[in-house]
UniProtKB/Swiss-Prot annotation:
Protein name: Small ribosomal subunit protein bS6
One of the Pfam families matching this protein, by short name: Ribosomal_S6
Basic and acidic residues: compositionally biased ranges: 104-116
Tagged with keyword Transferase: no
Amino acid sequence: MRHYEIVFMVHPDQSEQVPGMIERYSAAITGAEGKIHRLEDWGRRQLAYPINKLHKAHYVLMNVEAPQEVIDELETTFRFNDAVIRSMVMRTKHAVTEASPMVKAKDERRERRDDFANETADDAEAGDSEE
């Protein structure tokens, strides 16, 4: 089986359908003896340019190992699903399991925010003890 990176963008008004879509696509892949190495839901993001007069879309990234028949089926599903406004399927040489730069940046921001909150709380406690 080959490795693939799949990115699809969902209409922002259909964001509540994304978990169900991910479940269906994951079931199709695992049902054909495939494996999902990485699944990231990036959420709603600003588009670089308008697509069908839309400025935002819900992004989903999947790295999978699956037979070609399943990938063909997924591409057909993307093409005929009106909620999916764009999709891309790329073949990769190896399974990608590490977090994408999008998720890494989000985690770093979260860590900085938590560190700042902890420092602020420590400063407040130190100020209380001095009184």
